[in-house]
Design a protein with these regions (language model features):
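Glycine/Thr-rich phosphate-binding loops of Rossmann-like dinucleotide-binding domains
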Residues: 6-8, 51-52, 74, 136-137, ...
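Acidic/polar active-site rim loop that often engages polyanionic ligands
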Residues: 7-15, 66, 70, 176
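Conserved SAM/SAH-binding loop
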Residues: 23, 99-103, 118
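Glycine-rich dinucleotide-binding loop and its adjacent helix/turn
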Residues: 2-60, 148, 154-156
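Short beta-strand/turn micro-motifs composed of small residues
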Residues: 1, 45, 68, 169
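Conserved beta-strand-loop-beta-strand element in the redox core of flavoprotein oxidoreductases
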Residues: 106-120
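FAD-site-proximal beta/loop scaffold in flavoenzymes
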Residues: 15-34, 113, 121-176
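Rossmann-like dinucleotide-binding cores of NAD(P)H-dependent redox enzymes
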Residues: 40-42, 48-104
Length: 176
């Protein structure tokens, strides 16, 4: 249970394309960075993890381009808060592309090219961090009620509709 990385409906995803969700993913990425020392990185997803990784990679002297499907970075917060973050990223050298829906990752002799990413630049390293989705299969099979996006429905005490079964975190439907 918990959550798993969302998968984008991209063609061309394979070796050399990374996600960051687990410690194992982190160690794989770290090994890739040490072994290959990429100079240009593309990060698809400008949420918290994407922004943190953009900062971490720029500290390693990697040129970073950050691609966001929506009109602002951190789409979960108000635009008046996201704009200064966008500006700070730009000031540190991150190329921020908003309203950029990447539809394909093409491997070329000179690196990876993002189709729909608003640039023809190629990259040595690609990271896809577009959020998570509930990993509710076990609870669904047990009969738990879920939403259309498979988040487990709970009450104010975090109880599911199943006797003595509680759920919390990325797995459950949130109420804002």
């Amino acid at each position: 249970t918990g959550a798993v990385p969302k998968e984008l409906p991209l063609t061309g995803v394979g070796d050399g394309i990374h996600v960051l969700h687990t410690m194992g993913d982190f160690f794989d990425i770290e090994a890739q960075l040490v072994q290959h020392q990429p100079k240009r990185a593309a990060i698809i997803g400008a949420g918290y993890v994407g922004i943190e990784m953009a900062e971490a990679l720029t500290h390693r002297d990697v040129a970073v381009s950050l691609f966001q499907r929506g009109s602002e970075v951190l789409s979960t917060i108000d635009a008046d808060l996201a704009t200064p973050i966008n500006d700070a990223l730009t000031q540190t050298g991150v190329n921020v592309f908003t309203n950029a829906t990447v539809t394909e990752i093409a491997q070329t002799p000179s690196g990876y090219r993002l189709i729909g990413g608003a640039t023809d630049e190629t990259f040595d390293f690609v990271l896809v961090v577009v959020g998570v989705r509930p990993n509710s299969t076990l609870l669904e099979e047990a009969g738990a009620e879920v939403t259309t996006n498979h988040a487990v429905i709970v009450n104010d005490r975090m109880q599911t509709n199943l006797p003595d079964i509680y759920a919390a975190g990325d797995l459950v439907q949130t109420k804002h």
